[in-house]
């Protein structure tokens, strides 16, 4: 089939948007022959329906979107039913990036024993937090995990979870909370502390999911998209001022950032986490699988790697495209 002039991506969360906004607005997509349009699940958009978490797979399979960012559980479920269309093509980030903020009198993880920690209900959120606390030496049987509203519902949706979590700690509703970057910096600016937790490998944020029927019928489009994504990561890492300007304009107002320092901090942390070659790391795949799919008896007989197809990425890599981008850096 012909090359797509517009590629539509549905992002599972506003937290993916630092990269997607730069990808969309940097000119990289146009360089590779297409216009990129990005919608965000749960975020109202002018003259468009608000997409829900539950309809992501159906929207991808119907052709409404060419790619999804996220959708970490459904490909296993679909495959377990005999539907092999959903697959992951690339992974731009392989490490958990949540931050733990807390009351000003709490200075180390061990002090969280017996305390109330606000967290999200998704297995990849509360599950990673529990793992990180255990690695930090915390007896989590003594911790009360307060689950925020499910993603996209109520005042504790991911759209506003950073500022609302800071406010709840300051009101003494809870003692601590895990938040996205850069709300650890914002919390410190408002008198709270942030505790560093042990690193955890996990499939996270911008996982590129596709309908393989579409990919096989439109390989030129799929390869162009992946090459543009790879170049967008390079742009993000090497064009700091331009990337920060895009984030300040397109992302900061949506999530409640307060100042250029928070934009620059967010960019710096993301830049360090993004993979020049967006392959999934084995421990990251294993961790996500164990947190989520392994607990589902309807899908846990599917191997962790069955839903990954990185041969297009490997083809791009073997061509020397990625190495050439970074050769002079």
Segments predicted by a language model, with ranges:
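Short, glycine-/small- and polar/acidic-enriched structural segments
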Residues: 2-158, 165, 175-181, 195-200
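Short polybasic/polar patches that bind polyanions
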Residues: 30, 34, 79, 134, ...
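Short linear loop/turn motifs
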Residues: 37-45, 261-273, 302-315
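Short secondary-structure transition/capping segments
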Residues: 49-52, 80-82, 101, 188-191, ...
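Pocket-lining segment of extracytoplasmic ligand-binding domains
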Residues: 154-158, 162-253
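Secondary-structure end/capping motifs
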Residues: 218-301
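Conserved C-terminal helix/tail region of periplasmic/extracytoplasmic solute-binding proteins
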Residues: 292-329
